[in-house]
């Protein structure tokens, strides 16, 4: 098997064999040998050799290759969407939107580099002040499984535009998507060594993260892993570390006129991508009283009709499987622990088959749970918290170490003004799902949710460093000399 891409060539890994599986059927989706520490070392060395030539290449020449990549993505949209659906379980309709987002990120990233970084000049006495931006060098990109094309792409594209070279370690649960994406880069004409792919599980990731020749590490994934990386690089200020992690995101429901609109946005917030978006609402704050009862009844009614199915089912389902049978079992276990602490299931989650990743969208009332654990349950497990006052809802919504996304569904503009001023999150939406975001806006959060904004537009900020210069085309002795100097 030739599943690693190093120095412009597909080669076999020398590490242990592993495989990914379709979580909706348990069929093998990809199999191959992982990258050993020696393979990782070769990938980093290849990126280091390629850096001088790639960074010296004219900006427009780099952009031409990246634009070609976007065009090829559009041409191969269906094939790549199928690869995404097969490995992640997400329905084809959603996988297609992921590929479209990958292509759209290119134009935004190019614009971002020119506007946020690029080169700027200002005249000054006897010269000109110039601000330029320089690439860091070799950067490691770690990708997640929930958006195995789109999210790593949000690091890789701006990194390449800025002139960095990349070693890409995808999730071990979606290696096939990574291969398909790198094949597109290869066809787009990316020079050898500029982008290298190392497939593998934990040991491959450790070898790359520990490598002494990387200049930056860009990570999207769990808060636990990101926190470990932050500790690891705590004594290495020379490493640029960009972390985009999870959230225990709140959605506050007000007493709105359009009940079905509120239920729709809540379902989108909690259950889109089978709840496997880092911006999905985990905690739903519902007012006490008659409106809250009507909301919960309608929410439960519509949720009970959501059917999960295989990614290529016809007709298409709203939800597919979660990423693995193991992930499904962990969600059911999380529900059981909450019940033991006093939570009351409204719609109980079950795993359809212990070999598969199918679970149903579930709702559990955790109002009576004392010391509710501040955990991100990465799946369709919506926790209901009843509140008496709006201020109480905001206080409890902010009771988290995370701070990725938050949302308010309310007709009252004054309530929104109060909410946006007092809520602590990097993405705060009004009358929109919590997982609605734009690549042209910052994507990221506070606290344990991360330290940078890896959207297409703001990723430019951490993909290059500013270099300030004061320049004069002519060397002349100043007319006025400092005291004590005699010429």
From Swiss-Prot:
Disulphides: none
Molecular-function annotations in GO: succinylglutamate-semialdehyde dehydrogenase activity
Sites where the protein binds NAD(+): 221-226
The protein's annotated pathway: Amino-acid degradation; L-arginine degradation via AST pathway; L-glutamate and succinate from L-arginine: step 4/5
Keyword terms of this UniProt record: Arginine metabolism, NAD, Oxidoreductase
Keyword hit for RNA-binding: no
Recorded family membership: Belongs to the aldehyde dehydrogenase family. AstD subfamily.
NCBIfam families (alphabetical): arg_catab_astD (TIGR03240), PRK09457.1 (NF006992)
The protein's name in its UniProt record: N-succinylglutamate 5-semialdehyde dehydrogenase
Organism of this sequence: Burkholderia ambifaria (strain MC40-6)
């Amino acid at each position: 098997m030739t599943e690693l891409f190093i120095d412009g060539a597909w080669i076999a890994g020398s590490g242990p064999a592993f495989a990914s599986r379709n979580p909706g059927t348990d069929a093998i989706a990809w199999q191959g040998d992982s990258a050993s520490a020696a393979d990782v070392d070769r990938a980093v060395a290849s990126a280091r050799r390629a850096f001088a030539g790639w960074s010296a290449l004219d900006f427009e020449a780099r952009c031409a290759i990246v634009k070609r990549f976007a065009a090829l993505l559009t041409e191969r949209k269906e094939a790549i969407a199928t690869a995404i659906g097969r490995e992640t379980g997400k329905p084809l309709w959603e996988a297609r939107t992921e590929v479209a987002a990958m292509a759209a990120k290119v134009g935004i990233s190019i614009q971002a580099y020119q506007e946020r970084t690029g080169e700027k000049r200002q005249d000054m006495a006897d010269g000109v002040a110039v601000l330029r931006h320089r690439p860091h060098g070799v950067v490691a990109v770690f990708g997640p499984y929930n958006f195995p094309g789109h999210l790593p792409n949000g690091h890789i594209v701006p990194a390449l535009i800025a002139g960095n070279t990349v070693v890409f370690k995808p999730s071990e649960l979606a290696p096939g998507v990574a291969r398909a994406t790198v094949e597109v880069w290869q066809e787009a004409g990316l020079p050898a060594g500029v982008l290298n792919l190392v497939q593998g599980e934990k040991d491959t990731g450790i070898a790359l993260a520990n490598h002494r020749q990387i200049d930056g590490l860009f990570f999207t994934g769990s808060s636990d892993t990101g926190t470990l990386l932050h500790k690891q690089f705590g004594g290495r200020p020379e490493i640029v570390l960009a972390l985009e992690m999870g959230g225990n995101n709140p959605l506050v429901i007000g007493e709105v006129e359009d009940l079905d609109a509120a239920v729709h946005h809540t379902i989108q917030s909690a259950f889109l991508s089978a709840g496997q978006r880092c911006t999905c609402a985990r905690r739903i704050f519902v007012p006490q009283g008659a409106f809250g009862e009507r909301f919960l009844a309608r929410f439960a009614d519509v949720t009970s009709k959501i059917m999960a199915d295989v990614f290529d089912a016809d007709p298409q389902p709203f939800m597919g499987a979660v990423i693995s049978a193991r992930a499904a079992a962990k969600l059911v276990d999380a529900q059981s622990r909450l019940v033991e602490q006093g939570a009351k299931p409204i719609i109980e989650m079950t795993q359809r088959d212990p070999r598969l990743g199918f679970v149903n969208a579930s709702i559990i009332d955790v109002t009576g749970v004392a010391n509710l654990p501040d955990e991100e349950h990465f799946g369709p497990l919506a926790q209901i918290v009843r509140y008496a006052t709006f201020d109480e809802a905001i206080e409890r919504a902010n009771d988290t170490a995370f701070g990725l996304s938050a949302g308010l569904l309310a007709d009252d503009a004054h309530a929104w003004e109060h909410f946006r001023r007092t809520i602590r999150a990097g993405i705060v939406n009004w009358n929109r799902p919590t997982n609605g975001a734009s690549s042209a806006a910052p994507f990221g959060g506070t606290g344990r949710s991360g330290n940078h904004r890896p959207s297409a537009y703001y990723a430019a900020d951490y993909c290059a460093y500013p270099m300030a210069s004061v320049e004069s085309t002519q060397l002349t002795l100043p007319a006025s000399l400092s005291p004590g100097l005699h010429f």
